[in-house]
Curated annotation (Swiss-Prot):
Gene it is expressed from: mmpL5
Coiled-coil boundaries: none
Upper lineage: Bacteria, Bacillati, Actinomycetota, Actinomycetes, Mycobacteriales
Entry's family note: Belongs to the resistance-nodulation-cell division (RND) (TC 2.A.6) family. MmpL subfamily.
PANTHER family in the record: MEMBRANE PROTEIN MJ1562-RELATED (PTHR33406), MEMBRANE PROTEIN YDGH-RELATED (PTHR33406:SF6)
Protein name: Siderophore exporter MmpL5
Segments crossing the lipid bilayer: 31-51, 203-223, 230-250, 255-275, 302-322, 340-360, 389-409, 773-793, 803-823, 826-846, 880-900, 923-943
Membrane topology, from the record: Multi-pass membrane protein
Amino acid sequence: MIVQRTAAPTGSVPPDRHAARPFIPRMIRTFAVPIILGWLVTIAVLNVTVPQLETVGQIQAVSMSPDAAPSMISMKHIGKVFEEGDSDSAAMIVLEGQRPLGDAAHAFYDQMIGRLQADTTHVQSLQDFWGDPLTATGAQSSDGKAAYVQVKLAGNQGESLANESVEAVKTIVERLAPPPGVKVYVTGSAALVADQQQAGDRSLQVIEAVTFTVIIVMLLLVYRSIITSAIMLTMVVLGLLATRGGVAFLGFHRIIGLSTFATNLLVVLAIAAATDYAIFLIGRYQEARGLGQDRESAYYTMFGGTAHVVLGSGLTIAGATFCLSFTRLPYFQTLGVPLAIGMVIVVAAALTLGPAIIAVTSRFGKLLEPKRMARVRGWRKVGAAIVRWPGPILVGAVALALVGLLTLPGYRTNYNDRNYLPADLPANEGYAAAERHFSQARMNPEVLMVESDHDMRNSADFLVINKIAKAIFAVEGISRVQAITRPDGKPIEHTSIPFLISMQGTSQKLTEKYNQDLTARMLEQVNDIQSNIDQMERMHSLTQQMADVTHEMVIQMTGMVVDVEELRNHIADFDDFFRPIRSYFYWEKHCYDIPVCWSLRSVFDTLDGIDVMTEDINNLLPLMQRLDTLMPQLTAMMPEMIQTMKSMKAQMLSMHSTQEGLQDQMAAMQEDSAAMGEAFDASRNDDSFYLPPEVFDNPDFQRGLEQFLSPDGHAVRFIISHEGDPMSQAGIARIAKIKTAAKEAIKGTPLEGSAIYLGGTAAMFKDLSDGNTYDLMIAGISALCLIFIIMLITTRSVVAAAVIVGTVVLSLGASFGLSVLIWQHILGIELHWLVLAMAVIILLAVGADYNLLLVARLKEEIHAGINTGIIRAMGGSGSVVTAAGLVFAFTMMSFAVSELTVMAQVGTTIGMGLLFDTLIVRSFMTPSIAALLGKWFWWPQVVRQRPVPQPWPSPASARTFALV
């Protein structure tokens, strides 16, 4: 007897309705109602006993600051050394006036500073530059219409305490009445993060509404049944409520931390995954019902065909997201545990609550009955085309992938969070106000600190400090460096050596007129000397004449002495003869009364005087002779005296000329020195910077020391501003150059070997960039390994698992390239730096789901032969997987309505990746690879290229196939 044999038909064969019932689905079906009630009670308890997820996220918000980053360590250490606080949270308060800020604005500012300093709970310290005349210009705009103060807040950035501190500062500012025409803004990184969280929480409700709208529309389009869509929505809503409640419960009790990114992604991911799993379950149930199985058999077929896929998919997503916990950046680290726990809850609900709802609702009439036959014919044609032309189809799919892959080299990221937040956020408005008067970098400076082992408050170390500031300022792209040697960003006036030298001539300048007057008096002295010379020459002439006269007088007197003696002798003779008569005149008592008597007596008395005169003349003659001897000597001395006075006159004239020349020269030198000092000041040239020791005792300068030097003087800090955006790639690239410049500047100086700390905006984002690369590598590799292991366990094929992972990676590159094309090149918005890591991890996990479902279905149908199995798998899973993929993709794209552009970018990137994975990779690439590899696709399993020959099916079976 000859038995006719043929290959198996391409339609799926319904399983035996009397097959064994596995324990788990049987228990779920048996206790479906208690399971549903248990879930409802659990959901009610979780959502009633603790606040909603958004509220818990605000209460238990964790810091987004990477504590292990060098910049963060530096900022905290700088705060500790300067005794300004130990947090990394800072805010800027900006004052903006319609006119230059005056005394009223200063009074308001002082009042505000006092209120802030009084709030020690929320404010740790202030950098009051505007309140100090020495540093005021550094905190005020060039037009005088704006000023700012930096406030160090309590709590690390992103934490609930930091957000509370931001609100406290806003409250203080709002309670004060600024002067007319002056507006006050609270901005800065801490305020921006707090506003970002509020915007994210506001957006979450809108996202949920849009997401459910998208899901309802998609389900109605796919199933054309309000009841079926309502049942699926019930499953999704219950799964979402369970996930929200569970994560909120854990967060409320401080078991896990939350962030605005975690809550946003968790909600949308839970909705999308719950919808996908509901589609998998109901789709497979309706497929089984369409093949003629009864409700119970269809239930078990559904569970047996999808449970392992849902479990594998959920574990893949949970495991991949949990890999984010291995990262170092809190932005990613805080996503790991909440998303993983949320996905575990979604999977648990999908594998217990979902089948229980299907088991209950399937007993009531035709609630879950398919309204139309599944569209398998079109997908079978796709499968047949793939089996027939696997190579060209694979090439076409790869060509489509190249559209995105070729865009990747032009990928540029952006680290400025402001660009991805609404412009009307208070912090963004504050930044905008500041940028109207300051450069963008002034609000986002870098802070470099050099810490030595000794007190640097001395002239020698200040030379090194200025050298460091100059070296940093010389770095390309640096526009401003504030330090103790340049408090307002410019060198301190009058601190150059040329100016100090010019100042030393100030006293000479003050005595210049006095010295000139003294020099002028020398001419008067010369005139006096000349007068004396003239008198001396006249005196010399007279003295010469006197000498001659004296000599003649001596000669004459010598003769006169002889004559007088001779006269005396003759008178003596006369007296001797007339002595008797003379005696009469003397004894006559009345001689006085007798005129003749008294007259003759007087004559005789006169004759007696001749002796005295002779004696006197004899005594005078030696004197005259001596005078005659001295007068020539005196006359001889006079020319020498005149010559001496003439020499004095000449010397005085020479001295006058010399002094006058010196004074003119010193005046000219003083003018050159002053001009040189003024030139060095005007040019702001500090090549010869020097501060004398007495400056350190100046009270104003000591206030400046408090701003830039630590209390013990062992550390000095520099405030550095970039020329452009510090959060750009160019700004980030300068960080290494700044460190190198500071290190090179202290070589060979007393500060050599000092510790250098650098923090700030660009330094932080450099660490984030480096950490992002590291975290992406760690999370990506760990996620790929985990996905490969799960795929390997599910498919039990090394090649199939490798193909799934490889196609997912290819899909990831293509989809991210498409996102770059749309956002960067079409919309003109660079992708935020968070997008790559978030999208990669989620796409790695979710993208593998649809390939897993296809390969799992292919594994079920492989007994019919590889090519037939591909056709059957494509026909059986095509519509379900496509519907699930589209729902998941558009659900993620609902992030586009978020106020946070970064979440819109993450959502659209994931959505485009899922569309590409669903429509290209799962539909064409993976099955074409399976067709090309043939039996090697299932290695190390042994499969047949063709099925084992079997008898022709019975007429009943043929009719069944015909229905399909």
